Amino acid sequence: PREYQKAAFENWKNNNQKGLFAMATGTGKTITSLNCLYEIYDRKGYYKAIILVPTVTLVNQWEEECRKFRFNNIVKVFSKNPFWQDEIDRICFNEKYQTDDLQSYIIISTYASYSRPKVFEKLNSLDKRRVLLIADEAHNMGAESMAKKLKDIPYARRIGLSATPERQFDESGNAKLRKFFGAEEAYTFEYSMDEAIHGANPVLCKYYYYPHVIRLTDDEMAAYIELSEKISKYFNYDTETFTTKDEILKRLLLARKRIIHKAANKLPAFREIIQKRFEERGNLNYTLVYVPEGLKPDYFGAEDDFDKSDIIGEDVDTDRLINEYTACVLNVDGHVTVRKFVSGQKDREELLRNFATAKVQVLTSMKCLDE
């Protein structure tokens, strides 16, 4: 681990083994938390952890990282593993009847799976003192459907990870989250993007960011104003918070957000950007396009099949948008190679290799770049 990752462990250990780590994307939140688990293993001779993640893709990514630490007894709780219940039953049986406390395991689950009553009850029956709960993208735990379960989660050892732990317009959820992770006064550990790029030992590369401002169409603006007027009725200007978490308000906020997501003038602006880039360079090698979504990404409350929160392409607008942006790239020049890169894609590893060698010059992607 890097020095700042060691510092995170010390802060966590000195905070009764609870903590909320606010770390910039790319600085190694996963490794930082697994280092805490390894330190327990190094001192106690066992590892016991439950890791919660928003999507199925992250379940698999976390498994890969765990194996790099030589953590091998791993159970993935999601629909694509038909044996997970038997594996959990075995762990629970051993926990209950084994006199040896050194049984080691890691259980990786989507939030959607974990929140199901039977799964929630079974996993919470494990060793309360020894299990380390790691919540990836911990802001998901502040969501109303999860926040009401926090009081029933018994694990003494806790780590919350997020580049953005604060939930926008949800001070109640934020307060519950901070209390749960023992970070009511301040984050247990914080490592900002500025420090990661400009600090004494930088770990992230510098980058250029060029905003291109687009305007809403008249129809989009009219719809945006109409929704804003309805939303304003739920807003308390004295406290700068919403007065309710009513489903009607959520739908209004979502509808307004989709107007921005799908703004029609984004496509011609994108066309100008890539055309200029091609004219300047003669190719579009290593171009990664993050297409706006038809639907708001909803990691929580997702099914999982259980949980299809990681699968896109079922929404007509989603298909239309990614197809339009892909066609836009193809129209730049007949020699440009472009592929769609979406969740659930079987050849994604080969596709990434081809992108790295510029066999595929452009990837158009949606949602699977999140988190």
How would you label these PLM feature ranges?
Residues P1-A22:
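Conserved pre-motif I regulatory segment
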Residues Y187-N283:
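Conserved interdomain linker/interface between the two RecA-like ATPase lobes of SF2 helicase motors
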Residues T30-T32, G45-R70, E293-L295:
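Conserved Walker A/P-loop ATP-binding site and its immediately adjacent core
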Residues W84-T99, V119, L288, D315-L330, ...:
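Conserved helicase ATPase core of P-loop NTP-dependent helicases/translocases
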